[in-house]
């Protein structure tokens, strides 16, 4: 019996942290511990109305608290059976508990009269009415851009699965692919698809609350809510949605506080069959400094990647962009852009925009020489502004600098030597390739002497940890990265 009382007290303590004084008073002040039978703890409510309301609002939260504290088999049962009228003092070894149950004993007397029950019910109804008045009548989604649609998304072999899944989610949110994580490199169309999901769902399901937000905005909003003591308002905003779309989830790496908040938000929405969609620049297994339990949540549903577009898709993208911008140039010029710019969709569109600028501002005829110049500018800009060049020259540069600085050979780095200094060099090589290229862990493994995905992932995580804990290692990695960037 005492254990059951302690469990109920724990639940009250945890719930009180998340509610205002008014809320806690309305919902929990008039509850009484009744009895425990096996794994069931019976709690008396003043009336049937109160029982139904508290089950609707707090069953899920109570279950979370029980699981979090290792009471997986315990079930809280609410009943409108009145408390026993005899004294039944509930003494425990915990003074705080004794005070709590002393209050409950007094409540047993005052909650049995019809007048008291009616007062409690009236107060709850007033509170519900107040809540409804505070709810926004028109839910706004400021970050959804109407220009992103499924209709203007160009489909190819590299993105077809992601496209089909996204469209399916829009038609039946919370059903088939929940959660969904779309991953791939920069500028490949992840944001376009994520925003399209929001726009199409809004079009098909007018009454749903849909929110698109970047991971950075999610973080900033959370930090601001802590500063202004409005975390409750933050939780209410995100945990009562019908669809949550978070872009660039990798930006939350190394940020434990917001990961904890996202974990609880995820659980609240998922358990209520609300749709969750995320984008990321890598697969969940390759996320570093992310809690395992959050990564496991991402893999519950569908994980689908978008790879780099092939030539046919690049050509289609360039043609469509040229048509939208009203550019009339020979097809061989557009094909040259598609052939040379292989990085991503964003760079292809940037090349076409530059073509338009030359035509509109300089009033000149576009020829192959100008196209070559534009492409060269884009490729140079890409190298200067991203840590993800993905071509043979850059990989070779990384390797060359690593071998020179660590004074090792090609045979060392690609062989099977177990010497500590060689093993360390391989870990560093994997880490540098992961940070400076778009290569997957499998592709990195092939470069480093046929290592497996898990081996490469271990190397990356190890260097990540060592940089935080070992100043010498951190300085070495920083120096290597600076030399690679300069080169």
Curated annotation (Swiss-Prot):
Residues 360-487 are annotated as: Domain IV, binds dsDNA. It holds the Pfam family Bac_DnaA. Residues 79-142 are annotated as: Domain II. ATP binds at residues 187, 189-191. Keywords: ATP-binding, Cytoplasm, DNA replication, DNA-binding, Lipid-binding, Nucleotide-binding. Residues 1-79 are annotated as: Domain I, interacts with DnaA modulators. InterPro entries: AAA+_ATPase, Chromosome_initiator_DnaA, Chromosome_initiator_DnaA-like, Chromosome_initiator_DnaA_CS, DnaA_C, DnaA_dom, DnaA_N_dom, DnaA_N_sf. PROSITE patterns: DNAA. Residues 143-359 are annotated as: Domain III, AAA+ region. GO terms for biological process: DNA replication initiation; regulation of DNA replication. One of its GO terms (cellular component) is plasma membrane. One of its GO terms (molecular function) is DNA replication origin binding. It is found in: Cytoplasm. Domain I is involved in oligomerization and binding regulators, domain II is flexibile and of varying length in different bacteria, domain III forms the AAA+ region, while domain IV binds dsDNA. Belongs to the DnaA family. Oligomerizes as a right-handed, spiral filament on DNA at oriC. PANTHER family: CHROMOSOMAL REPLICATION INITIATOR PROTEIN DNAA. Plays an essential role in the initiation and regulation of chromosomal replication. ATP-DnaA binds to the origin of replication (oriC) to initiate formation of the DNA replication initiation complex once per cell cycle. Binds the DnaA box (a 9 base pair repeat at the origin) and separates the double-stranded (ds)DNA. Forms a right-handed helical filament on oriC DNA; dsDNA binds to the exterior of the filament while single-stranded (ss)DNA is stabiized in the filament's interior. This is Chromosomal replication initiator protein DnaA. It comes from Borreliella burgdorferi (strain ZS7) (Borrelia burgdorferi). The lineage of its organism: Bacteria, Pseudomonadati, Spirochaetota, Spirochaetia, Spirochaetales.
């Amino acid at each position: 019996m005492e254990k059951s009382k302690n469990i109920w007290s724990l639940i009250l303590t945890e719930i009180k942290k998340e509610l205002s004084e008014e809320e806690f008073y309305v919902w929990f002040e008039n509850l009484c511990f009744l009895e425990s039978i096996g794994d069931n703890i019976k709690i008396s409510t003043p009336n049937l109305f109160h029982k139904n309301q508290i089950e609707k609002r707090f069953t899920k939260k109570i279950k979370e608290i029980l699981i979090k504290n290792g009471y997986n088999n315990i079930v809280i049962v609410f009943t409108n059976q009145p408390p026993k009228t005899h004294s039944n003092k509930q003494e425990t070894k915990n003074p705080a508990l004794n005070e709590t149950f002393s209050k409950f004993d007094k409540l047993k007397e005052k909650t049995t009269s019809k007048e008291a029950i009616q007062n409690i019910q009236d107060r709850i109804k007033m509170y519900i009415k107040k809540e409804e008045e505070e709810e926004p009548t028109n839910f706004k989604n400021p970050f959804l851009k109407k220009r992103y649609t499924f209709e203007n998304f160009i489909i190819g072999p590299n993105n077809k699965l992601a496209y089909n899944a996204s469209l399916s989610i829009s038609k039946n949110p919370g059903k088939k692919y929940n959660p969904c994580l779309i991953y791939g490199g920069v500028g490949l169309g992840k944001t376009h698809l994520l925003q399209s999901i929001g726009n199409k769902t809004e079009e098909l399901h007018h009454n749903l609350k849909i929110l698109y937000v970047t991971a950075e905005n999610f973080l900033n909003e959370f930090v601001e809510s802590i500063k202004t003591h409005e975390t409750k308002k933050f939780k209410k905003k995100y945990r009562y949605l019908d669809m949550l779309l978070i872009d660039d989830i990798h930006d939350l790496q190394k940020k434990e506080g917001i990961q904890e908040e996202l974990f609880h938000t995820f659980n609240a929405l998922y358990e209520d069959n609300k749709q969750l969609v995320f984008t990321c620049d890598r697969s969940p297994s390759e996320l570093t400094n992310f809690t395992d339990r959050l990564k496991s949540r991402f893999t519950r549903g569908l994980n689908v990647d978008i790879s780099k577009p092939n030539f046919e898709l690049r050509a289609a993208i360039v043609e469509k962009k040229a048509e939208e911008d009203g550019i009339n140039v020979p097809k061989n010029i557009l094909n040259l852009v598609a052939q040379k710019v292989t990085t991503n969709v964003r760079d292809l569109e940037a090349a076409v925009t530059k073509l338009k600028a030359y035509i509109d501002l300089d009033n000149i005829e576009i020829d192959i020489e100008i196209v070559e110049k534009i492409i060269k500018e884009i490729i140079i800009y890409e190298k200067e502004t991203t840590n993800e060049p993905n071509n043979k020259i850059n990989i070779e540069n990384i390797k060359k600098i690593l071998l020179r600085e660590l004074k090792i050979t090609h045979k060392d780095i690609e062989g099977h030597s177990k010497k500590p200094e060689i093993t360390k060099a391989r870990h560093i090589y994997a880490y540098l390739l992961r940070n400076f290229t778009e290569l997957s862990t499998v592709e990195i493994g092939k470069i480093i002497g046929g290592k497996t995905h898990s081996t490469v992932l271990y190397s990356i995580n190890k260097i990540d940890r060592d940089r935080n804990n070992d100043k010498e290692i951190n300085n070495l990695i920083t120096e290597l990265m600076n030399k690679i960037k300069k080169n």
